[in-house]
């Protein structure tokens, strides 16, 4: 069962099993839910590589990466951008974590991170910037349905501590 947050965004409830996934990262490695079991996992959904808000959010996770790792968690970013875009984004900003290629946005849909958005009076469907923390058993431990890109990495680190 899903709950609704915000206008129409269906979110996975706390303590529910995370939806399964198996996606390639920027280097072609397959990352799956099964491969992440046994440790805490931060999954953040973002609209697009190398755009202002997405860059600030990624750099916030980068700047807090050592603390998040020391807290026993893995960070994973997810967008529909391709491998080349993800590699360049990670290289340009020295991102030390995997960026998954969600071609077709199925993972975003499964996690409730896809929905209606509007910009400049135009309504469209897209990735909604949101974050999940999964516990070592693959269950939802925390959800942020809306995030502040500049400080979200430190917010996640504070929660993990």
Name each model-derived stretch:
Residues 2-161:
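Chalcogenol-based redox active-site neighborhoods
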